Design a protein with these regions (language model features):
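Acidic/histidine-enriched, beta-strand-rich ligand/metal-binding domains
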Residues: 1-80
Length: 80
């Protein structure tokens, strides 16, 4: 879950899985985190809802280990 200051700068990020507060310095997330901002569509029971949540890297790893089919992972060729 993310909180922003009135000026739009990122203030804090808390893992929705375990409650860990992730490191944010000067509006920049300084550790591994996974953000979801998903707008549910017409064919869903959640149509019209947008879900926002964050996971720390450990909770992300725990989540994907539950998958029957692993996610596709590729190497990034450029880092921003």
């Amino acid at each position: 879950m993310r909180k922003y200051q009135e000026n739009g700068m990122l203030e804090s990020v808390v893992c929705n899985g375990c409650g860990k507060k992730l490191v944010v310095e000067r509006g920049i997330l300084r550790e591994g985190g996974f953000a979801v901002n998903y707008p549910w569509d017409y064919f869903s029971e959640k149509d019209g809802e947008i879900h926002h949540w964050d996971l720390c890297e450990d909770c992300y790893d725990s989540l994907i280990h539950q998958f029957v089919i692993a996610p596709e992972i590729e190497e990034a060729v450029e880092f921003m």
